[in-house]
Amino acid sequence: MGDGLSADRGQVVVGDRVVGIGQEPPSIGPSRGDIHIVDFPDVGGHVITGPHPGVIVQTDRLRRSSTVVVVPLTSAAKAAEFQPAFLVQIAAREAGLPRDGWAKCDQPMTLPKFLLGPRAGRLNPEAMDRVNLALRFALGL
């Protein structure tokens, strides 16, 4: 197998390995939409710290990375009464969690995977769609 680009999948062939865009996601690491207990570090300011559920929002194509992008969940959102576009209500039944909460899509964080605790649930597709919309708003995408 020679080196080159496979136009059909956007893959790059290096020797006998296929790398780059279009790879199938590996079977290791958390998946997009999974909820893990995360020990959010104290970075100062008005961001969540300590152990909270967090939704994995990075693409599954980065599952082999040593880092992960998560959005924190909280059951106490002070801005909830104003219903800002970056705050997504998550019902317990939508996530497999013991109580309702809020995804704080204005606070996505890239963290080392060692800060991830056990898997606590998974967002259903409808809840993940709402998180995607809120992330687009918060990040200007």
Predicted regions and their residues:
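Conserved functional hotspots at enzyme active or ligand-binding sites that engage polyanionic ligands
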Residues: 1-141
